[in-house]
Every structure is written in C-alpha cells, then in structure tokens.
C-alpha cells in the first residue's frame, strides 16, 4: 500500500470515547504517513439508518485502507467480507477489516491476539492450568478463546446467565476440538476462583458507570493472578483489592493497546512501536 497517507475508521455504536483513533493517527504520523482515523458512529445522524453493508461499500469507494469493528457489529460483519482469518472464523467475530487496493476485504480478530500479547507481556510466567473468567458477553468470547489457545488447560466461564456461559463454552470447544471450556453460574463463583490459578474479569464491573467488583474478592490469595479487561479506570476496584491481597495483576490497558498495535500492523504492513502507542493511549 501507499504509506504516504493512511485512511482508517471505526464502525460501532457510542464510540466517542474510543482511544483507538488517537493511537493509529499518532503512530501513522510518527512513521511518516499522514493518517486520518474516522469514527463512524451508527448512533449519529451521518451514519444512522445505514446498513453495515452500505458502510463497508462507502469505505471501499472512499479509499479506506481498513476499519475496526466494534459493538454491535463484530459478528454481523463476517458474512459481508471476502475472506476471514481462520482464528476470526473459529471465534465468529471480527474487529479488524483490511481493505486491499483491489477493494477486497479480509477480516481478523486482534482482540484475541491483543489479549494474548498483553498477558505474555504483563504476566509472562503465570500458571495457566486452571483459570476462571467472569463474564461471557461482550469481549468475553475473544478473551476466552485467547486464553485456551495460549496456554490455559481448563477454563471455567462464569456468567449470571449460565446458559450464555455454556453456549460460549460449547462454541469454543467445537472450534478448538477439545473440551477446555466449561460454563458455570456466576453465583457462587468464588469457590471456583479459590481453586484456580488465575481469574479474569470480562464484565463491565469496575467501569466508572459500574463501580465495584463482579465477585467477592476475599476469595483471592497471593497465589492468584488477576486480570481485568476494563481500562477506564485503569485501577479498578478488583485490581486494588487483588494487589492488597498480594496477587499479581494485569490491567485492561494491555489488551486495548495490543489490539491496536496488531491492527495497525495488518492495516499498513508497517511495524508499530508498542511503547509509542502505549504512551499515546496513556496520555488520553
């Protein structure tokens, strides 16, 4: 592709607070490319009422190099693409669409790779025999898939809707060809956490609009590692409690940064500077 200029976008609902545009624009500029990253918010007048297919077609005809896809379109976009990576196809969700010079679209999931890279970076020697993930919705499917394809032997996914947790488990087990994921009821999850090596919060609990924790943190001990996908605030109540109890922790910034790093590489073919993108993210 032509690296003199880069045109990217994010399709989703209520995306005004996303830090992804700033990371891509700053990294592109640092690499010598005039980079524009547009928010395509389907709740705004400009995009409201337009189908996902129409938005993809418009991006192609306008000369976009790529798109990030977020809630609620990560699943809906799959059948609209020319090709999808094996990983994204197995997961059934795409968050990154590369648009070739010929207009062909290819879908990828950098939520999966981003979480894995963040985990390797932040907790490189964490024990992964048994892990509990709290939350089966939203980004939970990508986190669960990432965990069991990057070292976790047995994953228990807990949700207030046990059927949703089991559906996620069944889908991932089918995709990876082994019984590694088990759905459980989030009520009483503390017993499962107490017996596990680590726990990941994949619920909105801990966000500014949802203060608190998704489970009783008194079940944690110093042998646990604790991860959180929430990054606003970076220091969630869960991570505060976990550190006070002697646990090693992984905050949500790592996944957020590395999903953007991996997407930038796919969009441009350029090698991004992780620390530079991290600095941009943390400056916002």
Swiss-Prot record:
The keyword Amino-acid biosynthesis applies. Keywords: Amino-acid biosynthesis, Aromatic amino acid biosynthesis, NAD, Oxidoreductase. One of its GO terms (cellular component) is cytosol. InterPro entries: Aminoacid_DH-like_N_sf, NAD(P)-bd_dom_sf, Sacchrp_dh_NADP-bd, SDH_C, Shikimate_DH-bd_N, Shikimate_DH_fam. Its EC number is 1.1.1.-, 1.1.1.24. Transmembrane segments: none annotated. Pathway: Metabolic intermediate biosynthesis; chorismate biosynthesis; chorismate from D-erythrose 4-phosphate and phosphoenolpyruvate: step 4/7; Aromatic compound metabolism; 3,4-dihydroxybenzoate biosynthesis; 3-dehydroquinate from D-quinate (NAD(+) route). L-quinate binds at residues 18-20, 70, 74, 95, 111, 259. It holds the Pfam family SDH_C. It comes from the Bacteria. The active site is at residue 73. NAD(+) binds at residues 137-138, 159, 164, 203-206, 214, 229, 252. It is an enzyme of class 1 (oxidoreductase). Shikimate binds at residues 18, 70, 74, 95, 111, 259. It catalyses: L-quinate + NAD(+) = 3-dehydroquinate + NADH + H(+); shikimate + NAD(+) = 3-dehydroshikimate + NADH + H(+). Homodimer. Belongs to the shikimate dehydrogenase family. Involved in the biosynthesis of the chorismate, which leads to the biosynthesis of aromatic amino acids, and plays a key role in the quinate degradation pathway. Catalyzes the NAD(+)-dependent oxidation of both quinate and shikimate to 3-dehydroquinate and 3-dehydroshikimate, respectively. It can only use NAD. This is Quinate/shikimate dehydrogenase (NAD(+)). It comes from Corynebacterium efficiens (strain DSM 44549 / YS-314 / AJ 12310 / JCM 11189 / NBRC 100395). The gene is aroE.
